[in-house]
């Protein structure tokens, strides 16, 4: 029970933090809970697709090759998870009347990502220990939130394109809302999967740089928040 609570705490804390960064017009809490729940549920199709793709990859490449590491982490995990998280946010919030400011998109996508991260964290911690919970609280959960920040920026541009009647731009930016966080996610997971001293140095430098960037980017987007327009 203690580990379960500890596993949920970082995701909930980050949802509260991103909620407070919305300085112009707070999002309905009911909507955010819905998005969070959809993010939790998105773990189910993600797990199924990951198992299927992993089996497909193993038909063509050996598990101990660099090719497999790249395919599995970028396509078999990152692409699938970011797609599922984006869909969770879209199904819950895209048509909601509260989605009327640009920063709203970041709040929604981060909330969806943290719903996903919360249940994933619980599953990992149930099979782990206190050290697992702390490590994931400091690394994995914030990484999901950062993916949500990246996703949210492009998600917001896609929403504005729809309001302008630009279907091509909308479609392009919805794809980017999955592809761009996939890159960060894929690099993160691949670095953890490779066994080399320099990789671990790269990983921790990467985490620090991305964390600092994401914090500054959220503050900037919050400060420049504006109403969505056609």
Q: Which positions does each model-derived feature cover?
A:
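Hydrophobic alpha-helical segments at protein termini of multi-pass membrane proteins
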Residues: 1-230
